[in-house]
């Protein structure tokens, strides 16, 4: 299963990136042995993409000492797709901060997620999951920020705002919260 699901991402193109991370030497060895046999059932072009990715610097199998090392790699790598193949995949989710899409268990291959399951396929790539989310409804909604201070709030914030504005060289900003504002109010 791990070998099949690793190939899903590696066949996209020779610029793809995919890693199988495991704490099990047996899983790593079985996947490494199985992957070439699956290439025989792919078009020559897709098999070559997969071969290039999995034998280059942007893909492969990583054997880690413990799951903490796996979490660290995942959160640093920030994958576009993360499939967790374990007996209890849900228990790992709380440790993942940076992944665009997380698929849980052996019955949730990326193929199904891409074509049928429903999660958005417009996902942050190349580590962008560290700071971005998948495309969603909020990307198409327009919002306005609204702020309002009362006189006391203005007085509380004015002097600090004036300091920041002066430091940044924005005299108009500083004047709008300083003595000129008080003077202008008196002329109203």
What is the predicted function of each stretch?
Residues 1-68:
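ALDH superfamily catalytic-core signature
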Residues 75-188:
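C-terminal core of ALDH-fold dehydrogenases
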């Amino acid at each position: 299963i791990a070998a099949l699901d690793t190939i899903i991402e590696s066949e996209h193109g020779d610029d793809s990136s995919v890693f199988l991370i495991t704490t099990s030497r047996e899983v790593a060895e079985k996947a490494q042995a199985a992957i070439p046999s699956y290439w025989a059932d792919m078009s020559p072009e897709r098999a070559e993409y997969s071969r290039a990715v999995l034998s280059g610097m942007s893909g492969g199998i990583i054997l880690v000492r413990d799951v903490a090392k796996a979490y660290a790699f995942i959160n640093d790598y920030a994958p576009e797709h993360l499939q967790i193949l374990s007996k209890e995949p849900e228990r790992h989710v709380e440790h993942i901060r940076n992944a665009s899409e997380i698929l849980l268990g052996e019955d949730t291959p990326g193929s199904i997620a891409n074509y049928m399951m429903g999660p958005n396929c417009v996902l942050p790539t190349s580590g962008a999951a560290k700071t971005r989310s998948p495309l969603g409804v909020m990307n198409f909604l327009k919002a306005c920020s609204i702020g309002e201070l009362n006189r006391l709030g203005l007085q509380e914030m004015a002097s600090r705002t004036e300091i920041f504005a002066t430091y940044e060289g924005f005299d108009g900003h500083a004047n709008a919260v300083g003595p000129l504002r008080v003077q202008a109010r008196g002329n109203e």
